[in-house]
Structures are given as structure tokens and as C-alpha cells.
A protein has these predicted regions:
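Helix-terminus/linker motif at the lipid-water interface of multi-pass membrane proteins
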Residues: 1-16, 69-78
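Alpha-helical transmembrane segments of multi-pass membrane proteins
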Residues: 13, 77-108, 122-123, 130, ...
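Residue-level recognition of transmembrane alpha-helices
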Residues: 7-10, 47-50, 92-95, 99, ...
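Membrane-interface helix-loop junctions in multi-pass transport and translocation proteins
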Residues: 4, 65-66, 70, 83-89, ...
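Helix-loop junctions and terminal segments of transmembrane helices
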Residues: 9, 13-37, 113-114
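Short membrane-interface helical motifs at transmembrane helix boundaries
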Residues: 56-83
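Membrane-interface junctions at transmembrane-helix termini in multi-pass inner-membrane proteins
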Residues: 31-34, 40, 97-124
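Interfacial transmembrane-helix starts/ends
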Residues: 39-52, 60
Length: 178
């Protein structure tokens, strides 16, 4: 029952950030293309917006998420303890912020694609998936905290791969231009 509630909580907390970002990806790539000469600098404003929205969303999920979750998806008889574990304010807030970290990695991936760094893009996603899956199965912790850590740390690792890769590629291009 906890797993089902957790899957529902993950789905609900990812949608408000990821669905608009999916629609925005073409615009993001276009903006990064216009600033190819300084991709990391062009990344800062949209990244700050994603983090700010994620932080505000996490706070809102922490404060009112459990109430709304129970209102929209009332627990079945005997499933109340699963809701305490997977739909608490701290869990919903953490899941929302983890989705903002995934959005940040998605945005950094768009930047990598815009500057023609397809291998960096792929490497970031492969690293994120590998880290997420590894942590999800290997952390010796209960399901909910293990899922939160895996869903947050995996995208951060992919984001770091994207950012370091694009920064190094930009420096290499600058050195060749001189």
C-alpha cells in the first residue's frame, strides 16, 4: 500500500513542474542557441526560476499537500498508515523539490543539445538514471526516504555532468577560436 501511495505522490508532485517544462523545451533550446557563445551564463536565469518555483512548490506541498492529497485521494480503510508515510508534508515537499531538480537537469540537457553536445546530453541522462536506480535499490533505508534520496541525487548528478561537460566544451571552443 505504501508503494502505491508513493507512486501516486511522485506522479502528482512531478506534473506541475515537468509538464510546463516539457512545453517550454523548444523555447529553451532556441534561447540557448541565440546565446551559444555563453551557454552557461544564458542558463542562469531560467535555472534560478526553476529552483525558485521548486522551492515555492515544495513549501506549498509541505503546508497543504497532505490535506489536498487526502481530499482528492481519500485513503481506503486500513491504508491510513501508508498515507502517513508517503503523503506527509515533508515527503510531498521533498518530492516536489526533487522534481525541480529533475527539471533543472532537463533544462541543462536542453542547453547541451543547443550547443551541439549530444554526447554530454546522453551522458548526463545515463548517469542520472544509473545513480537513481542504484540508490533506489542499494540504500539501506525504508522505501519513502530511499525514493526521495534517489529521485533527488540522480538528477543532480546528471545536471553536474551536463554543466561540467558544456563548460569544458565551451572553453575548448574558445581556445580553438583564439
Amino acid at each position: 500500500v505504501v508503494l502505491g501511495t508513493l507512486i501516486l505522490a511522485i506522479s502528482i508532485t512531478r506534473s506541475p513542474i515537468m509538464i510546463p517544462l516539457q512545453a517550454f523545451q523548444g523555447v529553451a533550446v532556441s534561447a540557448f542557441l541565440k546565446q551559444r557563445h555563453r551557454p552557461v551564463a544564458a542558463f542562469i536565469k531560467p535555472a534560478a526560476a526553476v529552483v525558485a518555483v521548486g522551492a515555492a512548490g515544495a513549501l506549498a506541498a509541505y503546508l497543504v499537500g497532505p490535506l489536498l492529497f487526502r481530499l482528492i485521494y481519500p485513503p481506503a480503510a486500513g491504508a491510513e498508515s501508508a498515507y502517513e508515510a508517503a503523503a506527509s508534508g515533508i515527503t510531498l515537499g521533498a518530492l516536489v523539490f526533487a522534481s525541480a531538480l529533475l527539471a533543472l537537469m532537463t533544462l541543462s540537457g536542453n542547453m547541451a543539445l543547443a550547443v551541439n553536445q549530444h554526447r554530454i546530453y546522453l551522458a548526463g541522462w545515463v548517469v542520472a538514471a544509473a545513480v537513481t536506480l542504484s540508490l533506489a535499490f542499494l540504500i539501506p533505508a525504508p522505501l519513502v526516504p530511499r525514493a526521495i534520496v534517489a529521485l533527488a541525487v540522480g538528477p543532480v548528478c546528471g545536471f553536474v555532468v551536463h554543466m561540467v561537460g558544456v563548460a569544458l566544451a565551451s572553453r575548448t571552443e574558445e581556445a580553438h577560436a583564439e
